[in-house]
């Protein structure tokens, strides 16, 4: 029998002949307190390897130890915990509960509930929902969803708007979102109670109908009720902070907060400085839009070689004011004046913008059902129930079956029952309220147990033939909003090197006309449209080409003369090329390759 290697934190430290006994002995020592409870040990018999981990940073979770088919945690322990005679640490010290990492959990046989324990089980879940993290733990009835949907929701929860910090009014975060009327979810989980999610909720309870609406909610688009939005549904504020400091430079020069004078290099128009106070800083509650100056600032010149007509060095200051970002607007929310570590003056301006949901804003339920707003409909045109209930949101029925997010269907049923009974429903995965109890609550309040109702067309007033599934679901507004993403450009800055438009919304860049778009125009035979996009509207350049040698010729502006650097006296002709092509020729020359352009008469 080959010896089993033992690794500690990935380093080989020795071997042993009886691996099963060794691992069992180490676990006993850990449970009795002889070895640190933070140690985890795993045996891989097929590889003849034992791994021991003690390093920090491992994700570990608590489980109840099971021995001989019986959990070590008894009713007596639970009573002592309730009275305070025992604490959590006492349970660990007594070897009743232990923490396992991912490696050791690989070889553990964990029971979900005490009823299913047999002689082979090694551990028992404290509660089945504890296997989920914080983000996945807020999903009600998560055990009824497919795992990719739960994974998606765990990611999107972090993007949901809510009360991100209770002291948001005292902070100057670079960017921040704040939901105006966050609500606690009607359908909750035990992890929501444990984590204090109710203190900082990040969503609202929507009345949701599952039906199509004129095709405007196909492909996960959502239909929103305009009246609900006007009442404040999913309304939020966006905060952006700007800052500037009076930096000091070698030679005693420094930046200054002031309203720049007209002689300053880079001076803007007077209207751009209209909101500034005498000290060069904007007043609170001023309404600003992109390009408006928030902090008027001038800086010393970069170079001191400029000599005026009297022979002295001229100090012509530069305009370096802080302006509102391109494409943004808002109201100055707060102005903070303080000092940097070096003792220079520091100004911070926070601008707020109120945002009502609009077409293209992203929403998601707690079951990975994400979608963007496809249409905002007046309340009088929305469908309504026999009781006069108008849904806040309409989602497409196609979003449910293939994704198997049955948890959302159950949440809508539970939310409806909770609203009628004036209580919150426990939707904890595996151990929440039973589906039959929820259906019974609906029946007791005069509703169909399947959650369907007869709806009437808001436009014609006729009863819709199909019965519509309608209920209450918790929806989250995510920070992906149209206002931050919509962009168009007709003219703007170009790059110095390639003379092509810059890239990106923040830099007022162009929209890339890529290879695939080019191929489409080629396939259509739209030659002039292709030339317009890729040449005329991009980086058109008139290059002079020598007729004899095919080299790029030079134009001497002072002597008003065109000449070839090689042939000198030969004739040269203007040729329209892309500047990127001219740049390529220059780079080939730097590699000692002689590119020649052969000229022909224009047809």
From Swiss-Prot:
The subcellular localization recorded is: Cytoplasm
* Parts forming coiled coils: none
Q: Which cofactor does it need?
A: Zn(2+)
**Gene3D superfamilies given for it?**
2.40.50.150, 3.90.1070.20, DNA-directed RNA polymerase, subunit 2, domain 6 (2.40.270.10), RNA polymerase alpha subunit dimerisation domain (3.90.1800.10)
Q: Which Pfam families match?
A: RNA_pol_Rpb2_4, RNA_pol_Rpb2_5, RNA_pol_Rpb2_6, RNA_pol_Rpb2_7
Q: What is its main location?
A: cytoplasm
Q: What are the recorded GO MF terms, alphabetically?
A: DNA binding; DNA-directed RNA polymerase activity; ribonucleoside binding; zinc ion binding
**Which keywords, in A-to-Z order, does the entry hold?**
Cytoplasm, DNA-binding, DNA-directed RNA polymerase, Metal-binding, Nucleotidyltransferase, Transcription, Transferase, Zinc
Q: Which PROSITE patterns match?
A: RNA_POL_BETA (PS01166)
Any single Gene Ontology cellular-component annotation: cytoplasm
Summarize the subunit comment: Part of the RNA polymerase complex.
Output the PANTHER family linked to this UniProt entry. DNA-DIRECTED RNA POLYMERASE I SUBUNIT 2
Spell out the protein name for this chain. DNA-directed RNA polymerase subunit Rpo2C
**Organism whose genome encodes this protein:** Methanothermobacter thermautotrophicus (strain ATCC 29096 / DSM 1053 / JCM 10044 / NBRC 100330 / Delta H)
State the organism's lineage.
Archaea, Methanobacteriati, Methanobacteriota, Methanomada group, Methanobacteria
State which gene encodes it: rpo2C
């Amino acid at each position: 029998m080959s010896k089993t290697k033992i690794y500690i934190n990935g380093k080989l430290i020795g071997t042993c002949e009886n691996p099963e006994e060794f691992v069992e002995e180490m676990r006993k020592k850990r449970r009795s307190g002889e070895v640190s409870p933070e140690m985890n040990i795993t045996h891989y018999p097929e590889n003849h390897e034992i791994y021991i981990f003690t390093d920090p940073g491992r994700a570990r979770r608590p489980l109840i130890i099971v021995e001989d088919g019986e959990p070590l945690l008894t009713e007596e322990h639970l009573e002592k915990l309730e009275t305070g005679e025992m604490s959590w640490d006492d349970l660990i010290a007594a070897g009743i509960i232990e923490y396992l990492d991912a490696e050791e959990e690989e070889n553990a046989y964990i029971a979900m509930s005490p009823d299913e324990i047999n002689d082979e089980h090694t551990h028992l879940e404290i509660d089945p929902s504890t296997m989920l993290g914080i983000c996945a733990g807020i999903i009600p009835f998560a055990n009824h969803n497919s795992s990719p949907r739960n994974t998606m929701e765990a990611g999107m929860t972090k993007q949901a708007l809510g009360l991100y910090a209770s002291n948001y009014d005292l902070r100057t975060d670079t960017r921040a979102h704040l939901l105006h009327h966050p609500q606690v979810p009607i359908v909750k989980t035990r992890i929501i109670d444990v984590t204090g999610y109710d203190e900082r909720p990040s969503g609202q309870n929507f009345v949701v109908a599952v039906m199509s609406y004129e095709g405007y909610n196909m492909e996960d688009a959502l239909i929103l009720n305009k009246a609900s939005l006007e009442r404040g549904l999913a309304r939020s504020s966006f905060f952006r902070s700007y800052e500037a400091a009076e930096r000091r430079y070698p030679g005693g020069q420094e930046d200054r907060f002031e309203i720049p004078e007209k002689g300053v290099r880079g001076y803007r128009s007077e209207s751009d400085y209209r909101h500034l106070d005498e000290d060069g800083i904007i007043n609170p509650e001023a309404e600003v839009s992109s390009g408006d100056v928030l902090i008027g600032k001038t800086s010393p010149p970069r170079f001191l070689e400029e000599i005026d007509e009297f022979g002295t060095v001229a100090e012509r200051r530069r305009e370096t004011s802080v302006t509102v970002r391109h494409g943004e607007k808002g109201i100055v929310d707060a102005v903070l004046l303080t000092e940097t570590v070096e003792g220079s003056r520091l100004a911070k301006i926070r601008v707020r913008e109120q945002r009502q949901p609009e077409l293209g804003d992203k929403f998601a339920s707690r079951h990975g059902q994400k979608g963007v707003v496809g249409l905002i409909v007046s309340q009088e045109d929305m469908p309504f129930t026999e009781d006069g209930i108008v849904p806040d949101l309409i989602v497409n029925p196609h979003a449910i079956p293939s994704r198997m997010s049955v948890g959302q269907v159950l949440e809508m049923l539970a939310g409806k029952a909770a609203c009628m009974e004036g209580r919150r429903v426990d939707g904890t995965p595996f151990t929440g309220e039973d589906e039959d109890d929820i259906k019974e609550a609906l029946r007791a309040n005069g509703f169909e147990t399947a959650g369907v109702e007869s709806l009437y067309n808001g436009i014609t007033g006729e009863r819709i033939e199909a019965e519509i599934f309608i209920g209450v679901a918790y929806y989250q507004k995510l920070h992906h909003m149209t206002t931050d993403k919509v962009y168009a450009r007709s003219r703007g800055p170009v790059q110095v090197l390639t003379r092509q438009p810059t890239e990106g919304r923040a830099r007022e860049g162009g929209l890339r006309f890529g290879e695939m778009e080019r191929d489409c125009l080629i396939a259509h035979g739209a030659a002039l449209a292709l030339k317009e996009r890729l040449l005329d509207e991009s980086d058109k350049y008139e290059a002079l080409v020598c007729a004899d040698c095919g080299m790029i010729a030079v134009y001497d502006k002072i002597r008003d003369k065109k000449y070839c650097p090689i042939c000198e006296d030969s004739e040269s002709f203007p040729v329209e090329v892309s500047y990127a092509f001219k740049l390529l020729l220059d780079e080939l020359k730097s590699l000692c390759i002689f590119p020649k352009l052969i000229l022909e008469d224009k047809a």
